[in-house]
Amino acid sequence: MSVRLGIVMDPIASISYKKDSSLAMLLAAQARGWSLFYMEQQDLYQGEGKARARMRPLKVFADPARWFELGEEQDSPLAELDVILMRKDPPFDMEFVYSTYLLEQAENDGVLVVNRPQSLRDCNEKMFATLFPQCTTPTLVSRRPDIIREFTAKHADVILKPLDGMGGTSIFRHRAGDPNLSVILETLTALGTQQIMAQAYLPAIKDGDKRILMIDGEPVDYCLARIPASGETRGNLAAGGRGEARPLTERDRWIAAQVGPTLREKGLLFVGLDVIGDYLTEINVTSPTCIREIDAAYNTDIGGKLMDAIDRKLKAR
């Protein structure tokens, strides 16, 4: 019997054909003969105590001019699907949380949800990394300016960032003697009402912020180094960085081995680790990317490896 795979994502018509990781996953699933069903966040709902969706059958194509075709909308229980990929991009807001509640109902009805809804709620992408202090640069989370100032005085060169940012937004570098620290803290903490993260600056960022993809707790053999544009301290592609695929180093594999068992335990089947130099900086659990860039550089099939892992999970049930 064919696997019925649903996906919750941002509008498929607006994705970047060349870079979109969700499309890579869908192409891999379709190549296995699986049936695809498309949903956007607003299509999820609950009726008569059951999680449901207005979903549409989906076909995908390796064609930059026409990469998808949608069928007629149908109203169905999520329990009729075998697996659901939650690929809605941040922001991680209350609407995202409500979506995880609905997906958790589907999970309780026997659907495999990738990634596990509870873990999507629990694992803030910046805070999650602090569970592995042996892997991270000196890090502080606080909303009190005096505590943050003590940290910046100790480390002299630091990165300050919100806990809920994405794509490199609102990330500041502060160095000793910079007169702008007060306004940076006022802005990021919203006058002391919001927790933020401070990390000791890593000079290795000039060589790239590496995205290491993890499938069921095991690393893909290659990563994508996102190298900052001239004059930048952020490697994010959304902030103008350029991507360069590379093999993993021994240190990368060590970090992956430290984190992998926890990912498996939490049902986080597809995850992106962010590593600068020798240090883990973030663990991305909501809609990680960079599949297409690594596949293009090394002729890998990361989407296929993910579908293999999903297939194993389904058969083990």
UniProtKB/Swiss-Prot annotation:
The protein's required cofactors: Mg(2+); Mn(2+)
ATP-grasp domain residues: 125-311
Enzyme class: ligase
Stretch forming the signal peptide: none
UniProt superkingdom: Bacteria
GO cellular component: cytoplasm
CC cofactor note: Binds 1 Mg(2+) or Mn(2+) ion per subunit.
Pathway(s) per entry: Sulfur metabolism; glutathione biosynthesis; glutathione from L-cysteine and L-glutamate: step 2/2
Reaction catalyzed: gamma-L-glutamyl-L-cysteine + glycine + ATP = glutathione + ADP + phosphate + H(+)
Sections of the chain in a coiled coil: none
Keyword Kinase listed: no
Keyword Ligase annotated: yes
Annotated InterPro entries: ATP-grasp (IPR011761), ATP_grasp_subdomain_1 (IPR013815), Glut_synth_pro (IPR006284), GSHS_ATP-bd (IPR004218), GSHS_N (IPR004215), PreATP-grasp_dom_sf (IPR016185)
Entries under Pfam families matching the protein: GSH-S_ATP, GSH-S_N
GO molecular function (one): ATP binding
EC number: 6.3.2.3
Keywords: ATP-binding, Glutathione biosynthesis, Ligase, Magnesium, Manganese, Metal-binding, Nucleotide-binding
Chain positions recorded as ATP binding sites: 152-208
Amino-acid positions noted as binding Mg(2+) in the UniProt annotation, renumbered to this chain: E282, N284
SUPFAM superfamilies cross-referenced by the UniProt entry: Glutathione synthetase ATP-binding domain-like, PreATP-grasp domain
Entry-linked PANTHER family: GLUTATHIONE SYNTHETASE, RIBOSOMAL PROTEIN S6 MODIFICATION PROTEIN
Protein name: Glutathione synthetase
Organism: Pseudomonas putida (strain ATCC 47054 / DSM 6125 / CFBP 8728 / NCIMB 11950 / KT2440)
Taxon lineage: Bacteria, Pseudomonadati, Pseudomonadota, Gammaproteobacteria, Pseudomonadales
